[in-house]
Amino acid sequence: MSQGPIEVMLFGDFDKAAAVSALEKSFGAMAPRAALTVSAAARDMHFPAPSSTPVRLTHRGASDQAAAVVAWPTGGGINGISEGRQLETLAAIFRDRLFEKFRAEQAASYSPDMAANWPVDFDSGGYLMAYAQVKPADVERFFAFADAVAEDLIAYPVSADELQRAVEPTKQAIERAASGNTFWLNQLKGATYDPERFVALGKLYRDYNSVTPAMLQTLAKRYFVKDKAWKLVVAPQQGLGSVTDAR
């Protein structure tokens, strides 16, 4: 608590002069603080090495429940935040397609998900990750379906209608959230010492609204690389002995 910067952000209806005066007498009156040193190792974000054979973990729960994960490395950094936002749209389309694939080809009531993570405080460490809870017998089918969705997104641009259905909920969420102070607090956190966050906020809505099918296909080609994928299976202790045991 004695090191590092203190950032105070005020939002809402208040008297600016009174607020500045209060800050000068409180936080502004504190003694200078030493910089918080961060080691190079702490800032070095590593994605796991690719695994053609899934890493295996086991659980002691129900014998008919397993989980499967496949992830691809992306990037990071506030300067590349526009790409990170485009990847969120790509992930939404991937999620919908994976869900439909299970429903159409297996009539299964699984709810697979897909996440796009783009760390703004690090220049690397981001990922696209698809995952689902399935029956142990369907683990390999999950990986096959995920590979098929990735390959299709690489080969063909998405339709304008599919893109609209993927991005519209995000745009509406931004419009709703922007009416509250918490939205601005979360978006501008750290902007005092990283002005790029002001820039990133200024293009938030535009980044989602301007994404095109061609952009998403380019991203799919860049990141859905089979040789870079990392896979994980969490299986019951009895069963699925064909994957690497990493307990």
Regions found by a protein language model. Give the residues of each.
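An aromatic/glycine/proline-enriched structural segment found at the starts
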Residues: E7-A66, P73-G75, A235-R247
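Mature hydrolase/peptidase catalytic cores and their serpin-fold inhibitory cores, especially
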Residues: P112, M215-T218
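Generic structural signal for individual residues within well-ordered alpha-helical segments
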Residues: V20-S21, E140, Q164, Q217-T218
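M16 family metallopeptidases and their MPP-like homologs
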Residues: Q3-F11, D64-G77, I81, R103-S210, ...
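Active/ligand-binding-proximal structured segments within catalytic/core domains
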Residues: V70, G80-R95
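Generic, well-ordered alpha-helical scaffold segments in large soluble proteins
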Residues: A22-M30, P73, I93-R97, K101, ...
